[in-house]
Design a protein with these regions (language model features):
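Compact, glycine-rich, soluble single-domain proteins
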Residues: 2-63
């Protein structure tokens, strides 16, 4: 399985939000993330970048 870490981009810094994310879905209120442990989070954000080689997703707050 290919899980990713989700980071928030803010003021030039990346902050780790979630680990072991296997599902990302676009919803009306933003992005929904689900981990392999069943934890779910929704962020009012958009994807800034995705690195498959680093298993990393960077999001930023919606303007």
């Amino acid at each position: 399985m290919c899980e990713v870490k989700v980071f928030k981009q803010e003021d030039g810094q990346e902050t780790l939000l979630l680990k072991d994310v296997y599902l990302i879905e676009q919803e009306d209120e933003g992005l929904r993330f689900e981990t392999i442990f069943g934890e779910q989070k929704v962020y009012k954000a958009e994807i800034e970048s995705v690195s498959l080689t680093d298993n990393k997703v960077v999001i930023k707050e919606k303007a």
